[in-house]
């Protein structure tokens, strides 16, 4: 079995992640953010949580903060998000509902973090047609009568994106020039090191508010006023709706988002324009278009799709770790920690000789975000099973060891000369991502995929 340099780097990152957990946590539940061991132990841990069981923590505040910061670093966050209280009525629920629908679309198994190979089939053709899907997530109950729509382009964008961010209307500039159909979005919180691959505006159309007519709805990009006082708006996208079209309209905003990101001063807002097929201007409200100020959870919002730049993100993560290491050194280095004799991960070597089930294998490790008090910014999942690898890679290696050729040779040499060459290590050989839905500091809803977070298979390396 051959591994590329990138694979070894990924395995190294995961090994560091597991090492951090194993240094501090074990099935003894010294801190119940993490549960490890077999299924019975996990069930017992959950029962104790349900009974408000709270074991005495073995770690100091410093160690707790270090663990939290390391996990945030793995998640690509510089600090714990602290979203402000909800502003703007029900509009935020539109964005959250959409992201939750994307979360469900990805069909993530929260226990294993493994995405299903199946994809939803919207059944439509045009990129901005309306497709309705009833809500069963629970979040949509805030928006009575609201339906969520998929487009074919959107399904593809969701599956290819590493990060998806929903942007509600920026309330500071919500009603530009006193009209509910001109609005602005704050893209200042778009993450660094990620490239915009697609962006869309979602506007709700209520079929019950208008007569039996066809309308053309255009989205225009507003620009700074010229010397004559005019804005000279730029056409972005349009769609035609009929009398029975009810739901969220989707417009392509990729070019506008790229412009705003390159030139933040150019972001002066968007405008909706509605015309009859005869070319007559129609008030958008008369055509059933819901604008700013709606308190039924149907205000316009944007969704932006990103793909990460691995090199930039890896560099930023490395720099953050170096800064934190330097800070620790200035404060006197790493704090000493008493050995945890109850932690069977830390005492793996001594335990393995007494354990008949000693071979390298995957074991359960549950990471609980609620016990980190992160539920105020993490929407889903509440936790996930990360798993870890533990066991011996001793001679002779059997077929279940999933060993590399190098590990087999190393085992033979170790068997002949154990004092000169160590045994191969039991480590992850296959990893899979998880998807996390959370609020950022501006209470934008973010859906992000994190690679190499779940151990799918273990082997001797």
UniProtKB/Swiss-Prot annotation:
UniProt xrefs under Pfam families: TGF_beta (PF00019), TGFb_propeptide (PF00688)
Compartment(s): Secreted
GO cellular component term of the entry, any: extracellular space
Coiled-coil portions: none
Protein origin, superkingdom: Eukaryota
Residue stretches of biased makeup (Basic and acidic residues): 338-347
Annotated disulfide bonds: 360-426, 389-458, 393-460
CDD domains given in the database record: TGF_beta_BMP5_like
One MF annotation (Gene Ontology) recorded for this entry: growth factor activity
SMART domains tied to this protein: TGFB (SM00204)
Record's keyword terms, sorted: Cleavage on pair of basic residues, Cytokine, Disulfide bond, Glycoprotein, Growth factor, Secreted, Signal
Protein name: Protein DVR-1 homolog
Species annotation: Strongylocentrotus purpuratus
Gene expressing this chain: DVR1
């Amino acid at each position: 079995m051959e591994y590329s340099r990138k694979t070894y780097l990924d395995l190294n990152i995961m090994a560091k992640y597991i090492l951090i957990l194993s240094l501090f946590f074990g099935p003894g539940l010294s801190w119940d953010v993490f549960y490890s061991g077999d299924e019975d132990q996990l069930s017992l841990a959950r029962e104790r949580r349900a009974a408000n069981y709270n074991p005495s923590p073995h770690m100091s505040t410093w160690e707790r903060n270090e663990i939290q910061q390391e996990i945030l670093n793995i998640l690509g966050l510089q600090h714990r998000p602290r979203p402000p209280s909800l502003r703007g009525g029900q509009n935020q629920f539109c964005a959250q509902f959409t992201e939750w629908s994307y979360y469900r679309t990805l069909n993530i198994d929260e226990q294993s973090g493994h995405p299903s190979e199946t994809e939803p089939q919207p059944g439509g053709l045009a990129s901005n047609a309306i497709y309705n899907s009833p809500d069963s997530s629970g979040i949509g109950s805030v928006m009575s009568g609201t339906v969520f729509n998929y487009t074919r382009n959107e399904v593809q964008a969701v599956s290819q994106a590493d990060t998806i961010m929903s942007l509600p209307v920026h309330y500071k500039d919500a009603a530009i020039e006193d009209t509910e159909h001109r609005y602005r979005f704050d893209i200042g919180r778009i993450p660094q090191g990620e490239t915009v691959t697609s962006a869309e505006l979602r506007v709700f159309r209520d079929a019950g508010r208008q007569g039996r007519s066809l309308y053309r709805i255009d989205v225009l990009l507003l620009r700074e006023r010229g010397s004559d006082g005019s804005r000279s708006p730029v056409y972005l996208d349009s769609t035609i709706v009929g009398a029975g079209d009810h739901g969220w309209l989707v417009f392509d905003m990729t070019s506008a988002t790229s412009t705003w990101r390159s030139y933040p001063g150019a972001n002066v807002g968007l405008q909706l324009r509605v015309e009859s097929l005869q070319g007559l201007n129609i008030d958008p409200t008369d055509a059933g278009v819901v604008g700013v100020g709606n308190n039924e959870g149907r205000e316009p919002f944007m969704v932006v799709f990103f793909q990460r730049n691995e090199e930039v993100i890896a560099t930023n993560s490395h720099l953050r770790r170096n800064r934190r290491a330097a800070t620790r050194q200035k404060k006197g280095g790493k704090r000493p920690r008493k050995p945890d004799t109850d932690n069977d991960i830390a005492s793996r070597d001594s335990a393995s000789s007494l354990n008949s089930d000693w071979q390298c294998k995957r074991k359960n490790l549950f990471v609980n975000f609620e016990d980190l008090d992160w539920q105020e910014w993490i929407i889903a999942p509440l936790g996930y099973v990360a798993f870890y690898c533990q066991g011996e890679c001793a001679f002779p290696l059997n077929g279940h060891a999933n060993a590399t050729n190098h590990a087999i040779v190393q085992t033979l040499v170790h068997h002949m000369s154990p004092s000169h060459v160590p045994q191969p290590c039991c480590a992850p050989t296959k990893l899979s991502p998880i998807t996390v839905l959370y609020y950022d500091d501006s209470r934008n809803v973010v859906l992000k995929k994190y690679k190499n977070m779940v151990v799918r298979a273990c082997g001797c390396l």
